[in-house]
Amino acid sequence: MLSRLGARALVCLAGVAMLAASGCALMPREPLVQMPTTARAEPRPIGPASGSIFQSSYAGNPLFEDRRPRNVGDILTILITENVNASKNSGTNTSRTGNAALAFDSVPRALGGLFGTSQNANINGANTMKASGGASAANTFNGTITVTVLEVLANGNLVVSGEKQMAINQGAEFIRFSGVVNPRTITGDNAVLSTQVADARIEYTAKGVIDEAQNMGWLQRFFLNVSPF
């Protein structure tokens, strides 16, 4: 009776462990862009009318001012032009050789079996190591995304963030961007290159049948983690 209960308990524990492993395998990874991806402009207070044609209060669109973003809620176009190439090669070749010779005038009787009839000892040693390694990476990302100003810093820089979602058949693609923009780098077309954005975080992910097919199964991942090889 106890053996049956023990077997059932082991089966239950194994089932719970498999469910936990599957839950960990299906857990979504943490996105790079942690801040909100949009912001609404704050409403301007409406002041009393100061004239019949011209008003002294802020109207939102000054007459002698360009259209560059400078307030929370303004939009900005990011031209993503990322092209990163990196390579690294390293090699090591070392060798070491040592010789030592010892001579004894007399050998204790207790150690006579170690030296035999000779009273000399020679020690030789050699050590050689050769190693080489190399790594290379190439990434290219070109595209366009429109972001929103989330915050205006004290020095005038703009904290921007945005997201673009595209659903195609049974899959969905997400492009997220965040960073800090210097207003002086914004062109007359209200655009800025991604290479001129500080603390830029660019993320391109997808969800759907194609993304699921590229992921390793939870049981295979479990055995891969516990395997000592």
UniProtKB/Swiss-Prot annotation:
Q: Where is the lipid attached (S-diacylglycerol cysteine)?
A: 24
Q: Which organism is it from?
A: Cupriavidus taiwanensis (strain DSM 17343 / BCRC 17206 / CCUG 44338 / CIP 107171 / LMG 19424 / R1)
Q: Which NCBIfam families match?
A: PRK12697.1
Listed under subunit, the entry gives: The basal body constitutes a major portion of the flagellar organelle and consists of four rings (L,P,S, and M) mounted on a central rod.
Record-level GO cellular component terms: bacterial-type flagellum basal body, distal rod, L ring; cell outer membrane
Kindly list the residues that the UniProt entry marks as N-palmitoyl cysteine lipid attachment points. Answer: 24
Q: What is its main location?
A: membrane
Please list the GO biological process terms of this entry: bacterial-type flagellum-dependent cell motility
Query: What name is this protein filed under?
Result: Flagellar L-ring protein
Single Gene Ontology MF annotation: cytoskeletal motor activity
Q: What is the purpose of this protein? A: Assembles around the rod to form the L-ring and probably protects the motor/basal body from shearing forces during rotation.
Signal peptide (UniProt feature, chain positions): 1-23
At the top level, the lineage of the source is Bacteria
Q: Which UniProt keywords apply?
A: Bacterial flagellum, Cell outer membrane, Lipoprotein, Membrane, Palmitate, Signal
Report the subcellular localization. Cell outer membrane; Bacterial flagellum basal body
The way this protein sits in the membrane is described as: Lipid-anchor
Family per record: Belongs to the FlgH family.
Pfam families per record: FlgH
Q: Does the keyword 4Fe-4S apply?
A: no
Concerning HAMAP family, the annotation shows: FlgH
Q: Which InterPro entries match?
A: Flag_Lring
